[in-house]
């Protein structure tokens, strides 16, 4: 079971998917390989069945969280009298040698040893496909492969410099040097080690520093504005679509039934986000958004819908997941939406 701390989450992402990480360093929401794909971890919506990935430490540890300045790399700091370490969470995001953006469905968890002999247990508890089936693990010398009986085509691979057996058996680990985890949607061809992890960290760090450097600066509240813009960037799909939210089924009122899936692109809301990014120096976001809108026209006389799937899908469906309890028992949990059938005249004014 994953114990939910609060609704104070850090978010990491790479314009393909995103993860919500609690104040104690637990990944409680993650969909692979894309924003609207089935969840791997969803304890946000069901503490018992949803699945999470985190660190168990004694109550003596003090835990704090912040972002690496000017980036979407999240730092969770663990300290006690016995030792101290930091977990740096990020998704690789940078331009490759071919000048294309490299946005793999991957999460790195870089464990940086600071001092002493800190101890922890790893709680690796994936529940693929929205926890709709039995979870199956295969442990090899290189990785832990995980898939779900309800959807065995989608598989996740956990690589680590730590003992995979110790991780699987939840044994206590004493940290003596830098270590890492890599959770990937694909089996890796190249060797995965701590040096590779550091390279991916540096590339991603430089990408975000360059992105914020191109952003307009303000004399007042610049840090708050910059952080808000970084979040807006994370909610953008690489093709230009902008999501209304990174999650599904968080209730408008706890205990109520108005729980919707917002992992889609509503044109009015997206236009406001794009206008903001354009005004502060990111014209490329506006160009990608316009290309996305153009891609939704599949015939000469097509009309606007109020919203689309993040790949431009015009027809969507909604499914209710009865087996999940929902956030604070707020049922139902929904995936998908039928909001595309709604018609509101004011929705396209802002786009124009």
Residue ranges and their predicted role:
Residues 345-352:
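Positively charged, low-complexity/disordered segments
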């Amino acid at each position: 079971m994953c114990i939910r701390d609060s609704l104070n989450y850090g978010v990491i992402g790479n314009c393909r998917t995103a993860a919500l990480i609690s104040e104690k360093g637990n990944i409680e929401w993650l969909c692979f390989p894309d924003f609207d794909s089935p969840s791997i971890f969803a304890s946000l919506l069901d503490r018992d069945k949803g699945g999470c990935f985190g660190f168990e430490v004694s109550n003596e540890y003090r835990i704090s969280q912040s972002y690496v300045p000017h980036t979407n790399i999240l730092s969770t700091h663990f300290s006690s009298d016995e030792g101290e370490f930091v977990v740096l969470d990020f998704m690789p995001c940078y331009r490759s040698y071919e000048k294309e953006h490299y946005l793999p469905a991957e999460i790195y968890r870089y464990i940086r040893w600071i001092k002493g002999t800190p101890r922890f247990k790893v709680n690796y508890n994936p529940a693929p496909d929205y926890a709709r089936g039995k979870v199956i693990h295969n442990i090899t010398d290189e990785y832990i492969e995980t898939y779900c009986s309800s959807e065995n085509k989608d598989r996740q691979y956990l690589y680590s410099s730590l003992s995979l057996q110790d991780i699987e058996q939840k044994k206590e680990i004493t940290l003596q040097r830098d270590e890492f985890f890599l959770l990937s949607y694909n089996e890796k061809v190249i060797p995965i080690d701590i040096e590779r992890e550091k390279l991916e960290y540096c590339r991603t760090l430089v990408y975000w520093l360059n992105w914020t450097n191109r952003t307009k600066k303000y004399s007042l509240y610049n840090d708050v504005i910059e952080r808000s813009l970084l979040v807006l960037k994370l909610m953008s799909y690489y093709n230009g679509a902008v999501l209304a939210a990174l999650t599904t089924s968080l209730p408008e009122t706890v205990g109520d039934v108005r729980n919707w899936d917002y992992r889609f692109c509503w044109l009015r809301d997206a236009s406001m986000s794009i206008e903001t990014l354009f005004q502060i120096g990111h014209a490329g976001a506006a160009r990608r958004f316009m290309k996305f809108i153009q891609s939704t026209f599949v015939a000469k006389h097509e009309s606007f819908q109020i919203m689309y799937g993040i790949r431009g899908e015009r027809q969507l469906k909604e499914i209710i997941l009865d087996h999940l309890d929902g956030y604070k028992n707020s049922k139902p949990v929904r995936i998908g939406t039928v909001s595309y059938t709604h018609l509101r005249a004011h929705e396209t004014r802002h786009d124009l």
